[in-house]
């Protein structure tokens, strides 16, 4: 069994708890069980605290509390924003804490994949073969990742998005709900792909791409 804290008290934090709970229900080996010690958030809202308490989870404190008191040595980032994920993970890693990932048992994960620490894959997601998911990549419900694709660290793929085969998505990029990235394309660092956009050509770093076909300011 591994003691963990979930960092973040918002909506994706509770979705992450769903994934952890589903994982625990089916894991066979006791050492694979994830024991959630509590939630870490610097500024949780009252409504989010109440929503977590209704599920018997408590907000323990902020990042300073986690670093000083170490209720667990492993953390799961239940945060959707790629940039915020990066900031928090880099701080916690410097302090010697360890990233923990989790994959929902109802996700479909193919062969020969590389899955680095901190990856979260939600229910209904489909990950094809020879896919690389770098640190703290999040694949939300019903998203699809095609063969031979590489999602770089801190990328978030929102619900229902489709990333086709042979695609590279750069660090800290957000792919919006229902967006489609066509085969063989390159998406740079720190991009935002808008909801329902269809990406038909390479996207330079730092761009926000919206529409069908997706366009961005030059």
Regions from the language model: what does each represent?
Residues 11-12, 83-84, 114, 198:
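Short alpha-helical
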Residues 6-7, 40, 78:
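Short hydrophobic segments within beta-strands
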Residues 17-19, 51-52, 87-91, 133, ...:
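Short amphipathic alpha-helical segments
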Residues 23-50:
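NAD(P)-binding Rossmann-fold cofactor-contacting core
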Residues 2-21:
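Glycine-rich adenosine-cofactor-binding loop
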